[in-house]
Structure formats: C-alpha cells, structure tokens
Amino acid sequence: MFSAKARWIVAVVLRVAAAGAAAVAAVLMAMSHDEVIVYGMEVQAKFRYTPSLVFFVAANAAVSACSLVVLLVPSSTSKLAARLLLMADVVLGMVLAGAFAAAGAMAELGKNGNSHAGWIAICVQVPLFCDRVRSALVAGSATIVLYYLMLMYSIYTLPMFP
C-alpha cells in the first residue's frame, strides 16, 4: 500500500510529535508553582508537593526521552527487535495513561475540593498554579492521543509472522 520509506516517515513524525508533546507537558508541569498570602501566612503550591504530579512529570519525561532514543535505532532491525520495541511502547503508553489519570484526579481535587473529606479547593487561592497544571494536562492529553496513534500505526505496520 505505502512504500517502506513513507511508512518510516509517518512513524518518525508521529514519534517526534508525541515526544515533543510529552516534553511540553513535563516542562509545563515542572514550572507549576504559585505563592500567595492567606490570612497573613505565605502559602506555596508546587508540583513537587504532590506525588501524582511528580509522577506525571517523570512519566512524560521518560516517554519523551525514550521516543527520541528509539529514533536512533536503525529501521532495518530484526522483527524480534521491532516487537520488543512495540512492547516497550505499550508499557510506556500504560504508564503515560496512569500518570495522566493521577494528575487529572489531583487537578479535579484542586479545582473543586472534596466536601465529604473536608478538603477545600485551592485554585481560588493559587490560580496561576492551577492554570499551569491545566495547561500541562492539555499537553498530556495531546501526548496520549499522539502516542496511541503511534502505537496503532506501529501495530498496523508490524509484520504479523516471522
């Protein structure tokens, strides 16, 4: 249907786009911080204070780095190597989805709080922090879409039998 070179170009474009979106998501989340004075006390909000946001940064950074390192692998590798690479991509995709879900849950908690647990919403006090987290989540959702498109394309183009 498509030439080998055309398939390779599509795979590279998808991989670079996913790596770029993951890098943007990681950087945006890593830059998420805000300071305010509440009742005479200085309150800081930083991504490092929430393990799920740290996980989001680490997962996106790992996906970005691994996606770019894979580009160094020659396209003429064995079918076994291609399958191992596909399995690694699937695992990274699952980690990426888990990190996005965890960060999304924390963003929801920050925005609306939880009245049953007595947790107040913090986005009213630290809007800059919440805006940056929201921006990172938008980039993270783009990463997931691009990464799964790349996975589906890799599965489609991978030969089924040796």
Swiss-Prot record:
Subcellular location(s) per record: Cell membrane
Topological type in the membrane: Multi-pass membrane protein
Family of the protein in this entry: Belongs to the Casparian strip membrane proteins (CASP) family.
Protein name: CASP-like protein 1C1-2
Organism: Oryza sativa subsp. indica (Rice)
Coiled coil: none
Record flagged with keyword Phosphoprotein: no
Family annotation (Pfam families): CASP_dom (PF04535)
Lineage: Eukaryota, Viridiplantae, Streptophyta, Embryophyta, Tracheophyta
Cytoplasmic side: 1-7, 74-83, 157-162
Main location: membrane
Extracellular side: 29-52, 105-135
Keywords: Cell membrane, Membrane, Transmembrane, Transmembrane helix
Record's subunit section: Homodimer and heterodimers.
Transmembrane stretches, start-end: 8-28, 53-73, 84-104, 136-156
Gene Ontology CC annotations of this record: plasma membrane
